[in-house]
Amino acid sequence: MELLVEKNIKNALKMPVSSGGQTIGEYEPRAYPQVIKYMGSKAQILDFVGDGLSAVSAHGRPLVDLFAGACAITAGFGDRFKVVSNDIQEYSSVIASTYLKRAESIGNFDLVALASVIAERNIAELPATMHYPATSTLASFNKIEKCNRSLLMKEFSTSHHLFTQIYSGTWWSAEQCIWIDAIREVLDGLYQDGHILKADFNFGLTCLLHAMAYTSQGTGHYAQYRDAKTVEGMADINKYRRTSVPVIFRRKFDLLLAWHLKHVVDLDHELVALDYRVCLGKIKKSVVYADPPYAFVHYSRFYHAMETLVRYDYPELQFMKDSVVKGRYRVDRHQSPFCIKTQVQGAFVDMFEGVKDSKSDLLLSYSNTGMINIDELIGLANNTFGRGYRVWFEEMNHTHMTMGRSKDRSRKVMESLIIAKKL
């Protein structure tokens, strides 16, 4: 079958009224507060995605955010569509909840004050050798780091010590980890005792994910923490070591809650954490937005700590040569077929078939940093969707965030939106 490749959708996008009777302006995304640092975030291209939604006359159908990640699409269009926000990583549905589900009770509690009772008691029990002074020699600083990391082998009797045990001296200090555990303990207690509902719990957890991100000494993700090898590097790491988790948490909590109460309307949104194939098998006729993590590295390697905070399940950690790997990776972290060269084609075919089976339309984000050539991808789309669909794409320049601390913090990429519309 001859490939149907149309590189320009400008004529479709210039139409003042779509076939569904909706003007293009109705697909403009709302402004929203971001909560975590996330590589490849689509927050900068929401207008571009809105044009794609207009081109398929999306109004009146659910919007399925199939690989929601940090939830840029979910957040940007959650006031205009019923959103099905899906990602196999559970932290994504927690963030999505903050943009989609009303948290009516969480503002009644001072979470920091409640957590301080727990945190201050546990911090007082830390040996003096674990505290970070404002200034230090490189050798002394690394001794403190090693002392913090020694908590990995300690036996704890408290109910909430996951971060203190696993992550002290890595991306966070022991003191910061104690605060993370304490806030999580308060949220668990309020939820289990019925003082807050699930949406409130998720809101608080989202703010804690934010506090984690902005007190971490890493580069914006959790692949590996930095070692202090130079005086300059030590000074930068120590700046983050001495940053207050409760201060960052409370600041974000107040700002985010003000936005949340003003803008969030529950349009019968759905939050799911499923394999993309399972999710597609459950949907009705929709518009599916897909931004799969097709790169040579697995995103779970970068965001496993967030998944662990959300699941709070004291995971088994990966070992190498009888030692826990530096990244503190979970043994069960997700491995995406889109990140495996031998599986990526089949993964896309499965996605196309799932969209076709539900008679949905597809908006697929593609960037030229991916593992598969765009012509090859469009060929797969045409062969899978067949004559019952029209397939085309549009391009734009986009700055992709790499999360490097100094060099190559971002790079220019060509972002494409591949569109498959049922005829």
Residue locations for each model-derived region?
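Conserved S-adenosyl-L-methionine
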Residues: 59-113, 297-311
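SAM-dependent nucleic-acid methyltransferase catalytic core
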Residues: 26, 45-46, 51, 154-302, ...
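Conserved phosphoryl-transfer catalytic core
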Residues: 96-169
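Conserved Class I SAM-dependent methyltransferase catalytic core
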Residues: 333-386, 395
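SAM-dependent methyltransferase catalytic-core segment centered on the flexible catalytic loop
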Residues: 295-358
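S-adenosyl-L-methionine
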Residues: 2-64, 72-80, 95
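Class I S-adenosyl-L-methionine
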Residues: 374-378, 385-423
